[in-house]
Regions:
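Short low-complexity, flexible loop/linker segments enriched in glycine and/or proline
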Residues: 15-25
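A short loop-to-beta-strand scaffold at the N-terminal edge of the catalytic core in hydrolase folds
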Residues: 44-45
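Long, well-ordered early-domain segments
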Residues: 1-7
Length: 194
């Protein structure tokens, strides 16, 4: 199943099945800022879990809409952030308006991180965390000029964090990876050999 943004940008209506599974998007919330989705990712994941067969492994896709353009302007001020903490990338003008936009972007990233933490806390509460493979990544770089939709680093550099309880040793790496490897890796981890 999934919540938020499922499989995209293809058109799965023709096939009649979304590769991400059944949608769990019924639970809504009042977002803290206008650029943030009203989808309650955490409660929708809980609905999926309640609906699932507890004797079977599960796969769930949380397709966060954040951070995407449409950030609420000056949301950073409501979060008591300061322009002085911003380091503007060299491909953008070093201007207070740009710094504010970067901080508005960070507000959405922090919101997404908080939602993910709540899902992790739920997995821990249910005793599922140590046996759940969690992959966090994105489909493109930051939504700024000279970044997203380009082949420069800022357009293709995406986060990647993977945890699986004590089954994967914690480490940081700067090695190049390919998202093409995700599906075979997940199938292998699930013991599916085809």
């Amino acid at each position: 199943g999934y919540t938020g943004k499922g499989w995209a940008p293809g058109d799965c209506k023709e096939r009649g099945v979304n590769p991400a599974g059944k949608a769990f998007n019924k639970k809504k919330l009042t977002p803290p800022y206008s650029g943030i989705s009203n989808i309650d990712y955490v409660e929708n994941f809980k609905l999926f879990y309640q609906d699932s067969d507890k004797k079977q492994p599960f796969c769930f896709w949380v397709g966060f809409n954040e951070p995407h353009r449409g950030f609420e302007r000056d949301s950073w001020q409501k979060e008591n952030k300061s322009l002085s903490i911003v380091s503007v990338p060299g491909f953008l003008p070093n201007h207070d308006v740009v710094k504010g936009d970067l901080l508005d972007y960070s507000v959405e990233i922090e919101y997404q991180d908080a939602q993910l933490q709540k899902i992790i806390d739920f997995l821990k509460e249910k005793g599922l965390f140590d046996n759940t493979l969690i992959i966090v990544t994105a489909d493109n770089g930051m939504a700024f000029p000279n970044a997203k939709a380009t082949c420069y680093d800022a357009g293709v550099h995406v986060p990647l964090a993977i945890c699986w309880g004590d089954k994967i040793k914690r480490k940081n790496t700067s090695e190049i990876v390919s998202s093409v490897d995700f599906a075979p890796t997940m199938l292998d981890a699930a013991g599916i050999n085809r």
